A protein has these predicted regions:
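Conserved glycine-rich cofactor-binding loop
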Residues: 12-15
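Substrate-binding pocket helix/loop in short-chain dehydrogenase/reductase
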Residues: 93-97, 101-106, 203
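Active-site helix of classical SDR
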Residues: 120, 156-159, 164
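Alpha-helical segment proximal to the catalytic Tyr-Lys
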Residues: 125, 169-170, 231
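Residue(s) in the substrate-gating loop at a strand-loop-helix junction
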Residues: 140
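Short, small/polar-rich loop/turn modules that mediate ligand/substrate recognition or access, typified
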Residues: 172-177, 233-235
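Short C-terminal tail/terminal secondary-structure segment
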Residues: 234-261
Length: 261
């Protein structure tokens, strides 16, 4: 098992990508801590999995970032891996640059960036005295490729990408690695329920692999960065998006076109 006996903390982990990460890490032999606001829900999930525990974290309460890390270290003796999975957006109000409300922009950037900064800062202090560790930030391909909307969400993820590299550089002397995984459109409950079929079909025209990603595929990338196989890999921004964002913007129109150059 790739992650045998590693102590892993995953934020925002009761559904979607976060839950897939918890399950995969547990399958690979890790001792996993689910950080969640809804502890009742988290405990229901943890009871069905082997080697999974719960700790409280509310992204709206800054003091809970250090307390969740302290709780993990008190219980397990150390923290080997931190997975920063939290991310919030306000699709109805996070629009294009001109029309996004300034407060929506500030609130979104603040919550998303603060969660990574504060959780990582708390974890680094313990990792540094226990021989190192790995921090994995779940970002978003929109942090690399500007979108026609979601100015706040995309900006927050771009900042997280930068912070990933900064932590990697500044904490390398403590043998602490930091990498980011950038999902594209992923088949989570949120995507399935909040996006129309027309939009999803239009979007998938521009994914060269022709489908949405699966939460389990994001979890596989996380396991790589969490494990010893990536011991010399740090500061990397890994897109798991079916090549979305790399192809020409005309890809969706050209792929099935009979037009000749």
């Amino acid at each position: 098992m790739r992650l045998k006996d590693k102590v892993i903390l995953v934020t925002a982990s009761t559904r979607g990508i976060g839950l897939a990460i918890v399950k995969k890490c547990a399958q690979e032999g890790a001792k996993v801590y689910m950080a969640a606001r809804n502890l009742e829900r988290a405990k229901e999930i943890a009871d069905t999995l082997q080697g999974v525990n719960c700790v409280y974290n509310d992204e709206n309460k800054p003091e809970t970032f250090s307390s969740m890390v302290e709780e993990v270290v008190t219980d397990a003796g150390r923290i080997d891996v931190l997975v920063n999975n939290f991310g919030t957006s306000n699709p109805g109000k996070d629009l294009d640059f001109v029309n996004t409300d300034p407060q929506v922009f500030l609130d979104t950037v603040n919550l998303n960036l603060r969660s990574v900064f504060m959780a990582s800062q708390a974890a680094v202090k313990h990792m540094a005295v226990h021989g190192g560790g790995s921090i994995i930030n779940i970002s978003f391909v929109g942090g690399l490729v500007p979108d026609i909307s979601q100015v706040a969400y995309g900006t927050s993820k771009a900042a997280i990408n930068y912070l990933t590299k900064l932590i990697a550089v500044q904490e390398a002397t403590h043998c602490i690695r930091c990498n980011a995984v950038l999902p594209g459109m992923t088949a989570t409950e949120a995507v399935e329920s909040h996006l129309s079929d027309d939009f999803k079909n239009l979007f998938m025209k521009h994914i060269p692999l022709g489908r949405m990603g699966l939460p389990e595929e994001i979890a596989e990338a996380v396991c790589y960065f969490a494990g010893d196989a990536s011991a010399y890999t740090t500061g990397q921004i890994l897109t798991v998006s079916g090549v979305f964002g790399l192809a020409t913007p005309l890809y969706g129109d050209i792929a099935n076109s009979k037009a000749k150059r």
